[in-house]
From Swiss-Prot:
This is Hydroxyacylglutathione hydrolase. Thiolesterase that catalyzes the hydrolysis of S-D-lactoyl-glutathione to form glutathione and D-lactic acid. It catalyses: an S-(2-hydroxyacyl)glutathione + H2O = a 2-hydroxy carboxylate + glutathione + H(+). It comes from the Bacteria. Monomer. The keyword Transmembrane helix does not apply. Pathway: Secondary metabolite metabolism; methylglyoxal degradation; (R)-lactate from methylglyoxal: step 2/2. Keywords: Hydrolase, Metal-binding, Zinc. It holds the Pfam family Lactamase_B. GO terms for molecular function: hydroxyacylglutathione hydrolase activity; metal ion binding.
Length: 255
C-alpha cells in the first residue's frame, strides 16, 4: 500500500501533483495552479482525482479550483483560516485534522508564514509531506502575511518530522536558492556538492524535486540557523536562532 505521486510543471515554475492511493485508486490533486497542465497529467496517468487539497489561497495555487470541481466533482479541502479566499472550498481543516485519500491518511500541519493560514499535508505512513510554499528545496517562502518568527516556528514544526520524509514543494526555485545558499554558507561541502547536482539537473531540463528533510537540514540555510559556521558568516555569533533566520530571509529578499 503506497501513495503514488505524479509531479508535473504548471505555469512557469509551479509544480502540480497527483497523489494516488495504490490500493483503492483514489486520487487527490495537491493545489490547482493551471487547468490545462493538470488535465494533461490526468490523461497521461489515467488517475482521475476526487479530492483537491489546497495549501494556501494564492492565485497560482487555486486558479483552476472551480473549473476542475465542475469537471470532476472534486471535494475541495483547505485551510479554515483562509476559507473565504479559496474558491469552491467544501471542507475547512485546522491543525491536527486528518484527511483521507483512500487508505492513506494525511495530518494537517498549520505552517503559517508565507500566508497566515498556509498548511502542510503530511502522510506519515507514506513518509511524504506536501509543504507547498512554506519549505522549498534550499529555501522557504517569502513572508507576505507574517513576521519572521511565525515562519521560523512553522519550519521548527517541519524539522520534527523524520529525516527520511520526502518533501514536495510548490515551485521549482532550487537553482536560484542554491546560489543564495552558497552566498551565506560557502564552506558547506554538502551544499557545494548538491549545487553541482542541481545545476546538472536543470541543464537537462529535469526537476530538482522532491527532496528529503534530511537533505534540507544539511544544506538549507533557513533550517541551519543554529550552525556556528553559518552564524559566524553572518556576523551573528551570539544572536538568537530566530534573529539569524530573519537576517537570512532579509538577505534572500534582495538577493
Amino acid at each position: 500500500m503506497t501513495l503514488e505521486i505524479e509531479q508535473f510543471m504548471c505555469r512557469s515554475d509551479n509544480f502540480g501533483i497527483l497523489a494516488r492511493d495504490s490500493e483503492t485508486g483514489i486520487t487527490a490533486l495537491v493545489d490547482a495552479p493551471e487547468e490545462q497542465a493538470i488535465l494533461e497529467a490526468i490523461k497521461r496517468t489515467g488517475w482521475t482525482p476526487s479530492l483537491l487539497l489546497i495549501t494556501h489561497h494564492h492565485a497560482d495555487h487555486v486558479e483552476a479550483n472551480l473549473a476542475l470541481k465542475e469537471r470532476f466533482g472534486l471535494t475541495i479541502i483547505g485551510p479554515a483560516k483562509e476559507a473565504s479566499k479559496i474558491p469552491g472550498i467544501d471542507r475547512q481543516v485546522n491543525e491536527g485534522d486528518v484527511v483521507r485519500v483512500g487508505n492513506q491518511e494525511a495530518r494537517v500541519i498549520e505552517t503559517p508564514g508565507h500566508t497566515a493560514g498556509h498548511i502542510t499535508f503530511y502522510f506519515a505512513k507514506a513518509g511524504i509531506a506536501f509543504t507547498a510554499d512554506t519549505l522549498f528545496a534550499l529555501g522557504c517562502g517569502r513572508l507576505f502575511e507574517c513576521k519572521p518568527p511565525v515562519m521560523y516556528e512553522s519550519l521548527k514544526k517541519l524539522v520534527e518530522l523524520p529525516l527520511e520524509t520526502v518533501i514536495y514543494c510548490g515551485h521549482e526555485y532550487t537553482e536560484s536558492n542554491a546560489r543564495f545558499a552558497l552566498s551565506v554558507d560557502p564552506t558547506n561541502s554538502a551544499l557545494k556538492e548538491r549545487a553541482k547536482k542541481i545545476e546538472a539537473l536543470r541543464r537537462e531540463g529535469r526537476p530538482t524535486l522532491p527532496t528529503t528533510l534530511g537533505e534540507e537540514m544539511a544544506t538549507n540555510p533557513f533550517l541551519r540557523c543554529h550552525d556556528p559556521v553559518l552564524r559566524n558568516n553572518l556576523g551573528m555569533k551570539n544572536a538568537a536562532d530566530v534573529e539569524v533566520f530573519a537576517e537570512i530571509r532579509k538577505r534572500k529578499d534582495v538577493f
